[in-house]
Amino acid sequence: MTDQPVSRTALVLFSGGQDSATCLAWALQRFAHVETLGFDYGQRHAIELDCRDALLAGMTSLRPDWAEKLGEGHTLAIPTLAEISDTALTRNVAIEMGEGGLPNTFVPGRNLVFLTFAAALAYRRGMTDIVGGMCETDYSGYPDCRDDTIKALQTALNLGMDKQFELHTPLMWLDKAATWALAHELGGAGLVDLIREHSHTCYLGERGARHDWGYGCGECPACRLRAKGWCEYVARAV
């Protein structure tokens, strides 16, 4: 995670979740202009997209300098991803472990598709810096979250578009507790509280049950990782 020249512009993959909200704050701290990109791909937890407005409003209120840097927000609909994916993230089926130790929430190629679309949009808008919340420390084992995958894709995108894109993954080597700590480092308790209250992680789209770490079913893999990270973050902060 190196600081970038303030004159550069970044495109942040922003779903409305904890990780992408933290990455947005990270980008706003480092770049002169930041735009966001979300994807509506038929996910069960599409409510995450609705959470983005509250997060953006909270961040710009929290830090006026961030408000000056924040630019256009984009949303791309790619329903085909759900149509070709028989997963618990795109179908109303129980979440369980599949073959090879991967949960059936894994959507094959999702991050590859997201980053390719992001690069195409960045190309059109004259950007070369793309920020994503991929992580292979506290994660569900998804192969498209791994550092070697992201580096390989960066090479492919640069060759395929004849550009010098840089794919930033500031959370790659952080566990969930460290991700909470990074949010505090970037925006203090105000940002941590904003992410707790308004970001969405739960794969089932549950926002009726409130926990110390935020809203969710508390049982899906995403909720368990978020809850575990929150407890460890609080313990480390004592």
Swiss-Prot record:
The metabolic or biological pathway listed in the UniProt record of this protein is: Purine metabolism; 7-cyano-7-deazaguanine biosynthesis
**In its UniProt record, which GO terms are filed under biological process?**
queuosine biosynthetic process
Which positions in this protein are listed as binding ATP?
14-24
Top-rank taxon, per record? Bacteria
Q: What is its EC class?
A: ligase
Write down the NCBIfam families for this protein, in alphabetical order.
7-cyano-7-deazaguanine synthase QueC
The protein's job, in short, is: Catalyzes the ATP-dependent conversion of 7-carboxy-7-deazaguanine (CDG) to 7-cyano-7-deazaguanine (preQ(0)).
Task: From the Swiss-Prot or TrEMBL record, give the protein name.
Answer: 7-cyano-7-deazaguanine synthase
Source organism per entry reads Nitrobacter hamburgensis (strain DSM 10229 / NCIMB 13809 / X14)
